[in-house]
Design a protein with these regions (language model features):
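Acidic, serine/threonine-rich low-complexity disordered tracts
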Residues: 12-117, 151-246
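Hydrophobic, well-structured mid-protein blocks that either form specific transmembrane helices
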Residues: 105-150
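Bacterial N-terminal signal peptides
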Residues: 1-5
Length: 246
């Protein structure tokens, strides 16, 4: 997963977002949460997607959430098998490690990133460290971070937390509220359009939109993104909340 697109906003309408995040005990996700999606391209069912909170790991002394995002699908002679993993600090939500394994048609790419928030650097595939940011986010951890935020209708928010500084600021535009029906049921939803200066399913050119449940859980109900081979849409079909209590 990569960036998100927002339309232009007047400077006075854009709110910088504090790096502070809710206490761990109030997070809307927990270990064992698994969200399963139906994957469509141009309204044709082509496969499945999952978002999972796999566990709690220790990364260089930091206690970290380990999350995974997978999309598997096939249409005619084109297949998609993408796998992403993120590890981010349970307290600050700063990304510590990010893994991409992209297999789309004839395109394949695997990358591993290590982030070092304490010295604001990152490295790619074991290469020398490059300048980063102090509270980094990657494409996967960004979605979990957004789930912790209060989102005000009509507002645009800026984040200078993407781990590659040249891709900042990341913007998030709150577009509208609506009631939608997905295979998992009917939900009140809040629709956002994020933007990172990057390529992928959340790039500016993709005009991506994400529907989160308009409640304290902020479940990702639907995601739509324009890709070279058509419009990809994920719709929630099964919810396993893991260790999160009612």
């Amino acid at each position: 997963m990569a960036a998100l697109a927002v339309g232009a906003a007047n400077a006075e309408d854009v709110r910088p977002v504090s790096p502070e995040v809710p206490n761990v005990q109030t997070r809307p996700f927990a270990v064992g949460e698994k969200l399963t999606y139906s994957a469509k391209v141009n309204f044709l069912h082509v496969g499945t997607g999952t978002m999972s909170v796999v566990g709690i790991d220790t990364i260089r002394g930091h206690t970290a959430y380990h999350t995974a995002f997978d999309v598997h699908g096939r249409m005619l002679f084109y297949s998609v098998n993408d796998h992403y993993e993120s590890w981010f600090d349970t307290t600050t939500m700063a990304s510590l490690r990010y893994h991409q394994n992209i297999d789309e048609g004839t395109y394949e790419r695997e990358r591993n990133f290590e982030m070092y928030p304490e010295r604001a650097t990152f490295s790619e595939n074991g290469k020398p460290e490059e300048p980063g940011v102090t509270l980094p986010l990657d494409d996967g951890s960004f979605i979990y971070f957004v789930r912790t935020l209060s989102l005000d209708l009509g507002q645009s928010y800026e984040f200078n937390r993407y781990f590659r500084p040249d891709r900042n600021p990341v913007r998030l535009e709150v577009l509208r509220k609506e009631r939608i029906k997905v295979p998992a049921g009917e939900f009140d939803a809040i629709v956002v359009r994020p933007a990172i200066k990057s390529k992928g399913i959340f790039s500016a050119d993709s005009k991506a939109e994400i529907w989160f449940s308009d409640d304290s859980l902020r479940l990702m109900l639907r995601m739509k993104s324009g890709l070279p081979f058509g419009t990809l849409q994920l719709e929630l079909k099964d919810i396993n909340r893991g260790g999160l209590r009612e």
